[in-house]
Amino acid sequence: MADKEAGGGDAGPRETAPTSTYSSPARSLGDTGITPLSPSHILNDADPVSEQQTFLVVVAIDFGTTSSGYAYSFTKEPECIHVMRRWEGGDPGVSNQKTPTTILLTPERKFHSFGYAARDFYHDLDPSEAKQWLYLEKFKMKLHTTGDLTMDTDLTAANGKKVKALEIFAYALQYFKEQALKELSDQAGSDFENSDVRWVITVPAIWKQPAKQFMREAAYQAGLASPENSEQLIIALEPEAASIYCRKLRLHQMIELSSKAVVNGYSASDTVGAGFAQAKEHVRRNRQSRTFLVENVIGEIWSELEEGDKYVVVDSGGGTVDLTVHQIRLPEGHLKELYKATGGPYGSLGVDYEFEKLLCKIFGEDFIEQFKIKRPAAWVDLMIAFESRKRAAAPDRTNPLNITLPFSFIDYYKKFRGHSVEHALRKSNVDFVKWSSQGMLRMSPDAMNALFKPTIDSIIEHLRDLFQKPEVSTVKFLFLVGGFAEAPLLQQAVQTAFGDKCRIIIPQDVGLTILKGAVLFGLDPAVIKVRRSPLTYGVGVLNRYVEGKHPPEKLLVKDGTRWCTDVFDKFISADQSVALGELVKRSYTPAKPSQLVIIINIYSSEHDNVSFITDPGVKKCGTLRLDLTGSGGTAVPARREIQTIMQFGDTEIKATAVDITTSKSVKVGIDFLNY
């Protein structure tokens, strides 16, 4: 291959006879010049892998939008999964095997408490004092909804004050770290060191790279791991974790929502409603136990599966719904992703949003906005009261649901409007919501069910779209998991829409499925053998200009040579299958041999057929930074070649690099947040 140069500074192309379309400097849109020398996309399990560190225990943190928790397993007893100690506090009718994802900071912005403790303390504060404290809840969604997420992204507390999101996520993770290490130390009878622990943090599969990186940065700040010891922390995708756990289910650990088969004493003659009742009873009974045994072989459910059978996991949580399609590979039970993860912001928060809209309709948007600012703790109380009634909604419910209005709501409304809450309800045209003399909103079951409808409709529509895909048309099972999967209204909607296409199964401990699966993933991260790339990724390069093929506006003449600018050099395509361990290699040459840093812009697109980085839908999404200090020998060679190796088959994009001349490792930073 002819000699190639690329680079920063003023070094221009000096090539006269390129032998490859890639043999060109990449100098586009401010990129430091780079030359891809040897494009390759290979699977090579023999490549050196970093030495595996051994850990005594795996601790998984399920960091949820509405509730969070942790579970752990000692690596010597992988079949025993221990779910964290019971939380103090809790609401009637709500499982307290997890704790609310709520955090309280003092007026000085120092961490005070997390979970039920934070909520209860905030509730007991005097209203004038509460305004000074920073209370945050349901903040995880900010990472999904913020298009330009950075390390400086802010969150807004209940009192309207801003606080750095990274600080809040780090505080929350540090809290779980301390709780888990304390519990492990108590169990072991001696202090447990953080270095003994492999940490796993769950995130939605539909999250983009910046959000995953943000979670990792927060974990580093919380002291779970460090950039130097990044392998100590694994990011797990929530529906994948659920899938890993579901494949180990025994018959008594699940409820089938269909009238086709007898499952665990539920006969075909029973109504679907009886199945829901039984599901709730299973969930209730299961809360009594904290240690779960999992099969170290594949569960009984797979005895019906054959090589190549497919199933869908629908992870419906507080903020998002995540859909994953997996195919089983026997006999080991390894999993292959068949279609890139899809989903959207269709979690149970949508029901809360509809309730808030209803309150705005009855009492006025201006009042609700002011009430949230002036009485933040009372607003939290009102939403807690709604949460417990929301969980009582069911398709066959006939009696109304009562939601207690805090006294300060009634009092503040009278001051704000000059008339009573009761008067507002009478005057509003909202049917099905009445005022009771005990100071409660009485909602008819239809009114409550209507609050669920937009969110459930979105989930069903998304599933319908998924079932249209050829890869998904022959699925055998649909597993419904996540906290929102406990809602009988969602269960019935899924059963009605898809019960004739596949068998719909809910694990008994549906709210803990992801948590337990995340522990299993931490014990064996290689269980998912093939994933699908959610996006097309690549870099911008210069290619030799070809008359008639390249647009005239892309022509660049440098030192008498004609180049086409902004060419998209594709690493991987959207929805492409990528095996674990599959590597994408590129070689780059710095413009000047003495150059110490190469910065390469990474671009992404949802489309597959990308020709130029200026095509519609192509966005700059990150940078690859090659630090060449220390990688060279004593004498700087006339020409250096740096080979980068990228992995797209894991839950995060990873990169390594080596200086070909010296065979020394090059420090690589792949950054989707600070570019």
From Swiss-Prot:
Tissues expressing the protein: Expressed most strongly in brain, kidney and heart with little or no expression in other tissues. In the brain, expressed in glial cells, including astrocytes (at protein level). In the aorta, preferentially expressed in lesions.
GO annotation terms (biological process): import into nucleus; inflammatory response; liver development; macrophage activation
Chain intervals with Polar residues compositional bias: 17-26
Family label: Belongs to the heat shock protein 70 family.
GO CC entries: cytoplasm; nucleus
Subcellular location: Cytoplasm; Nucleus
Keywords, ordered alphabetically: Acetylation, ATP-binding, Cytoplasm, Nucleotide-binding, Nucleus
Superkingdom per UniProt: Eukaryota
GO molecular function: ATP binding
Protein's name in the database: Heat shock 70 kDa protein 12A
Known partners and oligomeric status: Interacts with SORL1 (via cytosolic C-terminus); this interaction affects SORL1 internalization and subcellular localization.
